[in-house]
Amino acid sequence: MSRVLAFDFGASSGRAILGAYENGELSYREVHRFENNPRDKDGHFRWDFEDLLANVRLGAQKAGPVDSLAFDTWGVDFGLLDSQGRLLEDPVHYRDQRTAGLVEEAFQSLPAGALYGATGTQILNINSLYQLLALQRQEPQLWEKAHRLLFMPDLFAWALCGAQACETTIASTSQLLDPCSQSWSQQVLSAFHIPQELFAPLVKSGTVVGEYQGAKVIAAAGHDTQCAVAAMPAPEKDAAFLSCGTWSLLGCEREAPIL
């Protein structure tokens, strides 16, 4: 029997789900649920990363021995490490107001059509691109110290096993990834003076990145919506999905992006 542990983070709470696969059947149950309470700190609205990480460890303890574990969260948010591999600050939450006005400013460097064509990502001021532009303009000293960016699912994995990896589904929410080549968009990085070295190596969903207390730490589909779509009980072709949470996303699966 295989035992796996999934940590799912929503806007108001997180949960640890223990799954078991035996004789061709999957069963699962919630072993731990906890509040996700972002807070105002140091001039920004932030994730309470220390508290959430403590609940991750508690969830793993409640689950007992497992073969593997993984994380999913919403997209766009990230943490920054310095050159010594230390978290520089609590990650800023997408509901923070630091990106106000930056979408229009960004169009001066790369017009909307070109930006969408390069990334296929809906242009929203919460996207990681605009969060990085805010960092460049408003906190240049912090920007200079930033050595590595890890999106939130990868940041939790790093905190448990030390691995620095960037899973592609969560990277796709950043407005920095080329969906056709599944690599960073050189056009976008160049236009906004973002060094590619800031990002950890891209890995595909399902990659084993490390180990925590004897369990494999897996970079699953880190973006919660894409994680849900992957598990959707639907035909392989000609199926649409409507994923409803804090907001709703409508889409369909295709062999290649439509841009």
Q: What is each PLM-predicted segment?
A:
Residues 38-39, 100-101, 208-210:
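A short acidic, often aromatic-flanked loop/helix-cap motif at beta-alpha or helix-coil junctions
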Residues 48, 69, 96, 135, ...:
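Residue-level signal for inorganic ion chemistry
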Residues 1-89, 117, 145, 200, ...:
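N-terminal glycine/serine-rich phosphate-binding loop of ATP-dependent small-molecule kinases
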Residues 9-11, 115-225:
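Gly/Ser/Thr-rich active-site cleft segment
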Residues 108-112:
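Conserved FAD-binding subdomain of flavin-dependent enzymes
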Residues 78-83, 87-106, 146, 150-184, ...:
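Glycine-rich phosphate-binding loop of actin/hexokinase-like ATP-binding domains
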Residues 57-64, 136, 157, 230-231:
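Generic structural signal for well-ordered alpha-helical scaffold segments
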Residues 14, 73, 129, 227-229:
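Short glycine/serine/threonine-rich phosphate/pyrophosphate-binding segments
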